[in-house]
């Protein structure tokens, strides 16, 4: 079975439970699902950069705490708690027998992983609690996955100019443009059907911004993997690699999507 078929089969298997969780799993079921994804991603992230079980499990634990702070505490308090948690993590990773440079590198990587994975993913349970939050999350997923899919096919068919050859040689400018166009088109179409009270222009803008955030997240994860010297973050999902490989764009889009869902009423959107 080739890679494309594996990717399609994996997507078909995962799509129904994902849709069910978004549409019918508000509250703790949805938060638990996203938290599970955060833990899996954190496990892959810390396995890429740290060799000892102590550092890996400590990183996963801090990421989990950051995620819990993000979903349980009021917004400002959550920010302060996240900073405290990251500071404690940094102190933990600074301790050890390695050289000061290595320990400082470890502390920085731990703080980055905890905030990027745990903090960014914590915005999804917050988003689903907003008015029409489940539909906004689906808009984000449509924009991200449409952009990812079309960027792949457009890039393979028409791609000539490398987008970032030192980070991800396979990505092209043409693929990125095609992916962004797909994010806008499919996101706008989705909004017309499921967010009829929101201004179409705002939905198109939201789809574009989320699509760009998703592409940035994809490139950022490619940068992390290149820095770690690995091709995939893991082997959990056939055809995709690891969980972090599959949701890299979703992670980056989380805070942007949350902000857009908050701003929708101010832009005349009722959801």
Features from the language model and the residues they span:
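Membrane-embedded alpha-helical bundles of polytopic integral membrane proteins
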Residues: 1-208
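Juxtamembrane boundary at the C-terminal end of a transmembrane helix
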Residues: 259-271
